[in-house]
Amino acid sequence: MNSETFSAGPKSAPAPATLTIASRESRLAMWQAEHVRDALRKLYPACDVKILGMTTRGDQILDRTLSKVGGKGLFVKELENALADGRADLAVHSLKDVPMALPDGFALAAIMAREDARDAFVSNDYASLDALPAGAVVGTSSLRREAMLRARYPHLNVLPLRGNLDTRLAKLDRGDYAAIILAAAGLKRLGLEARIRALIDVEDSLPAAGQGALGIEIAAHRSDVAQWLAPLHDPHTALAVEAERMVSRALGGSCEVPLAAHAVWRAGELYLTGRVSTTDGRRVLSAQACGAVMTAADALALGRAVSDELDAQGARDIVNALLAGSQVGKGDA
C-alpha cells in the first residue's frame, strides 16, 4: 500500500531560476495553472514561471463518453510526456481527472487545499433536480453522476455531456439540456458561481475521489521540483484524497465505473464514505469508516477498510462486469 504522493525529504534545493508548468488549454485548466504559477512567483520572486499549454486527446474526442474511449488518462498523457522529456517541470491537474494509479516514473508532488467538493445543479429554468418535470433532459459527463440521477430520479432523461466547462454551459444555454450537473469547484474558480442553482448534498451525490482538489504531478526523479512545491502542499487535503483514491484503486475503479469516495475531517478524525453503483442506479453499495489519520499509511489503511467492506457487499462483481462491458464496447467501436 504505497503512497503515490512524493516525499521531498528534509534537504532543500536552491531556489529555481525557471519553472515550466504543463497544462491543458481549457479556460479552467489555465486558471488552475495560473493559480499555481502565481503561488510559485510569491514563493520565488526571482523565478521565471511559464505555462506550456497543451491540447490532450481527451480534449479532442468530444463525440463519445470517456468511459468508451480510454478514460481519464486521455487528459494527462500529453502532459506526462512533457514532464518525461523535460519540456515541463510540473503539471497541474484537477485531481478527479487523474487516473487512480500513476504510471511508473511519475508522482504527485503536492496536493493543494480543496475547493468545494460538491456537485452543482445548473439550469436556466429550474431551481433544483426535484423541480424538473418527467422526461426533462439532464446532461452529465460521468457515470457516477448518471447512476445517481437514475437511482434518485428515474423519470428524467439522462444524456452524455462532453466538452470543457464553457462548452457544456453553451450547450445548456442553447437548449440542448434542461439542466446539467457540474463540479462546483470549477464554476467557483472561474467566477461562475451565479450559474449554480443548487449545490447537491454529498449524501445525495457522493463526489468523485479527489473532486475539488488540485494535484501537481512531476517526474518521480525530480526531487528538486518536489522540494520547491512543498509549501503548496496541504497535508489535510492530501490525507483525505489519499484515502479516497485508495478506495477506487483497490477496487480497480475508473471513469468506466460509477464509483465515488469522499472524506471529511471531523473533530480530528477522518470520515470516509465509498459508494459503488450499477450504471442504471438500481443497485447502490455504500460503506463508511473513520479513524485518527496521521500519516499516508493511515489514510491508505482507511481507504482499504472501506474498499474491503464494499468488496464484501459485491462491489468487485459490479466493477468487473462494467469493465468487461466497456472493453466489449471499445472493440465494437
From Swiss-Prot:
The answer on whether this UniProt entry bears the keyword Transferase reads yes
Q: How many cofactor units bind, and how?
A: Binds 1 dipyrromethane group covalently.
What CDD domains has UniProt attached to this entry? PBP2_EcHMBS_like
Instruction: Name the Gene Ontology biological process terms.
Output: protoporphyrinogen IX biosynthetic process
EC number, UniProt record: 2.5.1.61
What further note is attached to this protein's record?
The porphobilinogen subunits are added to the dipyrromethane group.
Q: What is this protein called?
A: Porphobilinogen deaminase
